[in-house]
Regions:
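Mixed-charge, Lys/Arg-enriched low-complexity segments
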Residues: 1-8, 45-102
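Amphipathic, interaction-prone secondary-structure segments
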Residues: 12-42
Length: 102
């Protein structure tokens, strides 16, 4: 099992992935005007690829969604990285909102 983060992603976005026995899971996070855009892609060694795209308007809904994802148990390091990177992006979004209001 491995976990990777893409440091070459554009500012305001993150790409994370983990590979295990059953295949690979990838997440793409990006700040957007309305909150946080998330893509979740599951790439099994056999079978169909699954992709979800979701936009969250607040951090609490994202955290609930993230904590209900099975990766929490299958790839705990990816889960921790996903929460940490999302928190950083939410913080960047809050800072941008605060500076535009001044």
């Amino acid at each position: 099992m491995g976990t990777a983060a893409d440091s070459g992603a554009p500012i305001g976005s993150r790409t994370l992935s983990a590979e295990g026995r059953r295949g690979e899971v990838r997440f793409f996070l990006q700040r957007v005007a309305g909150g946080l855009y998330v893509e979740r892609e599951e790439i099994p060694r056999r079978g169909l690829r699954t992709q979800q795209s979701v936009q969250f308007t607040d951090a609490e809904h994202f955290r609930r969604w993230c904590d209900n994802d099975p990766i929490r148990f299958e790839h705990p390091l990816l889960h921790v990285s996903l929460r940490r990177d999302a928190d950083a992006l939410w913080g960047d979004l809050d800072a941008a909102d605060g500076s535009s209001g001044a």
